């Protein structure tokens, strides 16, 4: 009993001595009394157990254990994801899974759909969804770190002898495009962050009275989105300029992602199953009317598109599929060396190259005018039968960024449309209250402020084609100038072959074929 008491007194004395330098003078006078006071061992241990020194240890251990549990759960999740990829999405292990390239492409697409599918408003992403996106896309993109190629490198030995050896490096297209796509990804997410704290427009519930009143012709086809509201007088000039600036920035990002996606798709091999399903000539694929328009002596791609019925997405996609099929047919006829093939035709090679160039021009215009168009039959076939994992990652990553850019631009257009309606309504009310305008002017202004549903939809489609769809390439619409005038007659020459990226940059030169140098 005596040793235990002495041990308790010594521990208490040392504890009070350590705290003596931090105590006030009044407390210093009480410490000798505290040091001489004897306490039972149980009370001494209880008092020591409540000290900050002892309580900090279990708290630290709990934090460490939680962190370890979180890391372990993330590791298990990553193992499950990669197990599913290795099995080709066939968890039964029966060998019925898809290729690794297609499985990885589907994984990136499904991840983006689960993360960005809930982005229905112009507002920053939720922190948990943002963290999940960054973490899981890093997992999927880490596969490309191990897709390497051999490149020559010089190594200097200790004796000063320079020797050339082969070293591994990430494949060239991945080394260039993966960092670029990551940058585009960050720019799109930062665009959403730029709308933090803006209170000049807001969203209301679809089922509320205010939400029903906020519905218009533009939002009737987007019933799943919450209607946007703006002040009665519309947005301020600074807010309107900010929206246009963000829209231009997103359009440039989408243009870059679209160019990367088109380049990757062009490098993918065309599957044999798609080639076997094609007709023998381009006339059958296009149809008589389209073939006649493309093969005429005078050809203007804008005028050609204006004559087509592109009122629905299905019709636009059908035209795109027909044109892509004809391009594949003409290219095969140009490069096929087998004279016994049944692909022979009486059309000369120069004309076939000219027709191919015109068809590719139409494709570029369709992709720019309808950026949200679904994938064509050729693109789906390439993605489905692709075996290159690197191409699969680049194609899927660029495609989802292109889709995210289109979504953000659509949300910005919704706000700008609501602002235009509010300003038109405000202008109409001021005009009717003034009473100083003639009757004819009143009727004209009333007609302009009370558009019918079809007129509003037509007006918005025209404005959208001027600002949203053609803005990707910095090309203004000049279709209103001289539509009835024929282009000047030029000698029949074989056009210069341009790549898809060159067409995006030099779209203004598509009115007439150029000389092939």
UniProtKB/Swiss-Prot annotation:
Residues 16-76, 428-517 are annotated as: Disordered. Keywords: Cell membrane, Guanine-nucleotide releasing factor, Membrane. The PRONE (plant-specific Rop nucleotide exchanger) domain is responsible for the GEF activity. The keyword Nucleotide-binding does not apply. It holds the Pfam family PRONE. It is found in: Cell membrane. Residues 65-429 form the PRONE domain. PROSITE patterns: PRONE (PS51334). Interacts with ARAC11/ROP1 and ARAC10/ROP11. Interacts with PRK6. GO terms for molecular function: guanyl-nucleotide exchange factor activity. Gene3D superfamilies: PRONE domain, subdomain 1, PRONE domain, subdomain 2. Guanine-nucleotide exchange factor (GEF) that acts as an activator of Rop (Rho of plants) GTPases by promoting the exchange of GDP for GTP. This is Rop guanine nucleotide exchange factor 9. GO terms for biological process: regulation of pollen tube growth. GO terms for cellular component: plasma membrane. Residues 66-76 have a biased composition (Basic and acidic residues). Residues 39-63, 440-452 have a biased composition (Polar residues). Expressed in pollen grains and pollen tubes. It comes from the Eukaryota. The keyword Cell membrane applies. It comes from Arabidopsis thaliana (Mouse-ear cress). InterPro entries: PRONE_dom, RopGEF.
């Amino acid at each position: 009993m005596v040793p235990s008491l002495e041990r308790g007194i010594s521990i208490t004395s040392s504890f009070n001595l350590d705290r003596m330098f931090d105590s006030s003078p009044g407390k210093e006078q009480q410490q000798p009394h505290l040091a001489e006071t004897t306490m039972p061992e149980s009370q001494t241990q209880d008092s020591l157990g409540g000290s900050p020194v002892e309580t900090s240890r279990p708290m630290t251990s709990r934090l460490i254990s939680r962190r370890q549990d979180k890391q372990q759960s993330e590791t298990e999740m990553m193992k499950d994801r990669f197990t599913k990829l290795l099995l080709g999405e066939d968890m039964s292990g029966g060998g019925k899974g898809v290729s690794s390239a297609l499985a990885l492409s589907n994984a990136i697409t499904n991840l983006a759909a689960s993360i960005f599918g809930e982005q229905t408003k112009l507002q920053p992403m939720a922190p948990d969804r943002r963290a999940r996106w960054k973490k899981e896309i890093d997992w999927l993109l880490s596969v490309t770190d191990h897709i390497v190629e051999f490149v020559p490198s010089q190594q200097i030995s200790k004796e000063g002898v320079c020797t050339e050896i082969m070293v591994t490096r990430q494949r060239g297209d991945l080394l260039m495009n993966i960092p670029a796509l990551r940058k585009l990804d960050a720019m799109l997410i930062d665009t959403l962050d730029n709308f933090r704290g803006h209170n000049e427009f807001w969203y209301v519930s679809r089922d509320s009275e205010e939400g029903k009143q906020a519905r218009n012709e533009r939002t009737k086809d987007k019933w799943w989105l919450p209607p946007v509201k703006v002040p009665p007088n519309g947005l301020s000039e600074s807010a309107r300029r900010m929206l246009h600036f963000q829209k231009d920035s997103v359009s440039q990002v989408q243009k870059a992602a679209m160019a990367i996606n088109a380049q990757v798709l062009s490098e993918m091999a065309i599957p044999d199953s798609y080639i076997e399903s094609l007709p023998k000539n381009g006339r059958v694929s296009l149809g008589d009317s389209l073939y006649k328009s493309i093969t005429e002596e005078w050809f203007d791609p804008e005028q050609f598109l204006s004559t087509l019925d592109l009122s629905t997405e299905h019709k636009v996609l059908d035209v795109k599929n027909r044109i892509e099929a004809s391009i594949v047919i003409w290219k095969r006829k140009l490069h096929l060396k087998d004279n016994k093939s049944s692909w022979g035709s009486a059309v000369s090679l120069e004309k076939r190259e000219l027709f191919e160039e015109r068809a590719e021009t139409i494709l570029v215009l369709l992709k720019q005018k309808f950026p949200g168009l679904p994938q064509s039959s050729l693109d789906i076939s390439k993605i489905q039968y692709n075996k290159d994992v690197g191409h699969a990652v680049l194609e899927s990553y660029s495609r989802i960024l292109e889709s995210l850019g289109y979504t953000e631009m659509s949300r910005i257009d919704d706000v700008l449309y609501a602002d235009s309606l509010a300003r038109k309504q405000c202008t109409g009310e001021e005009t009717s209250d003034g009473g100083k305008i003639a009757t004819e002017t009143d009727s004209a202004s009333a007609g302009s402020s009370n558009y019918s549903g079809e007129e509003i939809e037509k007006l918005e489609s025209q404005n959208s084609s001027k600002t949203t769809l053609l803005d990707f390439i910095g090309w203004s619409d000049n279709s209103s100038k001289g539509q009835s005038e024929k282009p000047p007659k030029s000698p029949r020459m074989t056009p210069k072959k341009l790549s898809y990226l060159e067409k995006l940059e030099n779209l203004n030169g598509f009115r007439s074929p150029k000389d092939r140098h």
